[in-house]
Curated annotation (Swiss-Prot):
Biological role stated in the UniProt entry: One of the components of the core complex of photosystem II (PSII). PSII is a light-driven water:plastoquinone oxidoreductase that uses light energy to abstract electrons from H(2)O, generating O(2) and a proton gradient subsequently used for ATP formation. It consists of a core antenna complex that captures photons, and an electron transfer chain that converts photonic excitation into a charge separation. This subunit is found at the monomer-monomer interface and is required for correct PSII assembly and/or dimerization.
Gene Ontology CC annotations of this record: photosystem II reaction center; plasma membrane-derived thylakoid membrane
Signal peptide residue numbers: none
Subunit structure: PSII is composed of 1 copy each of membrane proteins PsbA, PsbB, PsbC, PsbD, PsbE, PsbF, PsbH, PsbI, PsbJ, PsbK, PsbL, PsbM, PsbT, PsbX, PsbY, PsbZ, Psb30/Ycf12, peripheral proteins PsbO, CyanoQ (PsbQ), PsbU, PsbV and a large number of cofactors. It forms dimeric complexes.
UniProt record similarity statement: Belongs to the PsbL family.
InterPro entries the UniProt entry points to: PSII_PsbL, PSII_PsbL_sf
Manganese in keyword set: no
Compartments reported by the entry: Cellular thylakoid membrane
Mode of membrane association: Single-pass membrane protein
Protein name in the entry: Photosystem II reaction center protein L
Pfam family of the protein (one): PsbL
Organism of this sequence: Synechococcus sp. (strain RCC307)
Alphabetized UniProt keyword annotations: Membrane, Photosynthesis, Photosystem II, Reaction center, Thylakoid, Transmembrane, Transmembrane helix
UniProt GO BP: photosynthesis
Amino acid sequence: MDRNPNPNNLPVELNRTSLYLGLLLVFVTGVLFSSYFFN
């Protein structure tokens, strides 16, 4: 991963937010699928 030398910190925060949203989406999908399979 190449890191940009610019001091702008906004893309890093956006990437972190999108990463957390992706993990949350995977977690919710896993819970829904597990409840669907165990019913």
